[in-house]
Amino acid sequence: FAMEVYKDIRLVGTPPNSIGKFGGDTDNWMWPRHTGDFSMFRIYAGKDNRPAEYSTKNVPYRADEYLRISLDGYDEGDFAMIMGFPGSTQRYMTSYEIDRMLTITNPQRIFIRGERQKILAEDMLASDKVRIQYASKYAQSSNYWKNAMGMSRGIERLDVKRKKQEQERAFQQWAEANSVDGERYDEALGMIRDAIAASNEAYAAQQYLNEALQRSVEIMTPASYVIAAVGKKGKKLEDPEALKERLRGFYKDYNPATDRRVARRMFELVMEHVKELPDVFVAAEGQFDDLDAAV
């Protein structure tokens, strides 16, 4: 195939914020949505409709083939498609992975982030400074908190797990009828099922530690910046000023009292729900009289 590269691409339209964020957090990740969260770009070409470097004399590109947008509405059974390219997809998950999402991933994420967000909201309401510092952090946390709620609701409403099981039964029948030596596709689903079942407990603990500590307790963030900047052990820091600037940005929006409250609650949750704790918890129990002293 032939490819032409048009470099003169211009932003020509965006809706106002009141439309782009219509519904706010309440409607986030809920369907159907009425949010006009989009931008419009236009390709510009030379007067001969060929690729051209940017120029004020360029004109909108004229496509030989295009889809006409109808203003007549739609009827049941009309063709529909999604425009865009996802960075990743979960559409090929097995029923075993769907079950893990419904019983481990989403419930943990909803509960842990909800506990953290309650603390953030209390401190944000009590202080304008904290409200400004934590507005973006709260929004980031609540984004996939709400996503997990909407995802679970949609999976259950659409009976996705049962549909996956039907697909797997059909695949199994095909595999048993068509597998040959060296290509035992009839064993694939069983292997996936056993691997998921064997790793569920470790997965649950890892996710709990990730959500409750790595994603929730901020004081560990500067250490991650240093590790990322230095890289391998013993390597010299190549750009100290860039690291300092990143750390200044972190501390500008950091409130130790809020983070301490969050940390205390997160440690409580980890100690209550994770069976095999990391060594740091064992060391802390021997060093401090209680959780308040440790935090």
Regions found by a protein language model. Name each.
Residues 1-295:
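Terminal presequence/propeptide segments associated with secretion/organelle targeting
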